[in-house]
Amino acid sequence: MFKDIISNEEAKSFLINELKSRREQGTYIFYGEDRELLMEFALAYAKALTCKNTENDFCGVCDSCLRINSLTHGDLEIYEDSNGIKIDQVREIAYRVSTASYEGGNRIFILKDVEKMKKEAANALLKMIEEPEKGDFFILLANNLNILPTIKSRSMFLKIKMRSAEELGISQKEYNFFLGKGKEILEYKETGIDLNLGEPYNEIGNFIKNYLAEPNIENKIKIYKSLRDFFTSRQYINEIDKLSFAENIYFAVENDRVLSQEICSYMCHLIKNFDRIENLIAVKNMIKMPVNLKLLLKVFINEIY
């Protein structure tokens, strides 16, 4: 049920009111910094739109709710691409829209990272969300509202705020360590790991490889600790070791640009010099482009000084 979701009381009230209005179709933009929380709200609304047991909410235990949770519901479609949903995916959505509902009820289309969509794909999507078919609900997820204006003009906005340290039941120091990422914090709370114990920056490559092989919170924390060790030691690290640090990251990520960008984002949050942050963010944002990743990482690490 909506009441079981921690935080964002206003967002929950908005969705409940939408359900009470008996809307027959719609397009929404859920936006905020916590991607996992955006998806949690999107799936919660999807459950409420398809739940057979509960009115203006979801029970969480019926067959429909359970299949939404496991992403196996016949009328739930999720589209994503780390570099932005492509035109071919939008064409797939168009085909799906042209067919009948599998289960005879509402259909939910969740599109992730819509702020990354290129203009061609966004314009193609626009044709579908202008006048959705009865029973079709589009939920667009985005980190920000840097989205094609015509798409925004045809959507309802819902800001999903990051959960606070108090809501997550941790200290502000712990909250800052994870940059407020709720999913990681909840996983960390189950481990008993001491965040005060450090990890050496020169082991960053091994920590990344371990995480890629087994992506759990224990291995993720080791990456964070290693990055923090590099940051606090940066004034005492020579040029050769700096380049070695960047190369260790490059060879370990195996051209995984999403993880590379996440690592750079974490480092950006450690910087207090706002002039330098601007340059770092510019370099970080180039990672998603088809440019030399190894060179970008070297430039990024060099800019930290």
Named regions from a protein language model:
Residues 1-48, 55, 64-67, 134-137, ...:
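Charged, glycine-rich active-site and insertion segments that engage polyanionic ligands
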Residues 55-64, 70-80:
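Conserved catalytic segments around the Walker B and adjacent sensor/switch elements
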Residues 110-112, 125, 136-143:
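Structural recognition of the conserved hydrophobic beta-strand(s) that form the central parallel beta-sheet
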Residues 47, 51, 127-130:
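Short, well-ordered alpha-helices that flank and scaffold nucleotide-derived cofactor binding pockets
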Residues 13-19, 87-108, 116, 120-128:
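Conserved alpha-helical scaffold flanking the Walker A/P-loop in AAA+ ATPase domains
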Residues 73, 122, 144:
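ATP/adenylate-binding site constellation spanning eukaryotic-like Ser/Thr protein kinases
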Residues 78-79, 111, 160:
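Conserved beta-strand positions
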Residues 84, 116-117, 131, 146-147:
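Residues immediately C-terminal
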